[in-house]
Amino acid sequence: PLSAQELLSCDTANKGCRGGYVNNALEYTVMRGLSTEECLPYKGTFDAKCSEMCVDSMKVRPDSFCVLFGDNDIKREIMKNGPVVSSMEVYTDFLSYKSGVYTKGEDVPKFSGFHTIKIVGWGVEDGSEEEPDKGHKYWIIENSWGEDWGLNGYAKVSEGQNLFFEQYAYSILTRKQSEEMKQSYERKQKAASDAQKPNDVPDMN
């Protein structure tokens, strides 16, 4: 595992346990790389010193990261490469979540702030065998509040609630993935350009 503590202690663009931004953490990871959990174990405190030994040691460094827009992009990325990271709006009723599929209360509970989570999968509850997709669709997220919270640290969150994280999820890319994405983009640009070219007009002479 990679060191979450390094992001808390060494990423000066964020504020450790007092909060920060996902893109700042990802930029640090791309620019500096991350040490292993063994080198810099998780202490869960912002006061833990940034270990120079680990900062200078061998790092795992991705090539880049990208933003995923919408349900299909998120699901496609999870299927192909694994979990993605995002931030979600948190309301007071989410703090006491225990089980089931979380849906924000109708009485509009108090907004508590934004919180970074990991999206690890999705599912459907109460769907029939004939129409399995007609049930209650949800995301499976991994939280950072310990195993005593929710479903051993995880939660099922209803799809389409506009809790922000479906709009701005992030994926980390290896060099190969970056090249594949670049080539795919260039192919699409060329196809779009070719489609806009006027058809050849035959010479009438």
What is the role of each PLM region?
Residues P1-N205:
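Catalytic-core signature of thiol
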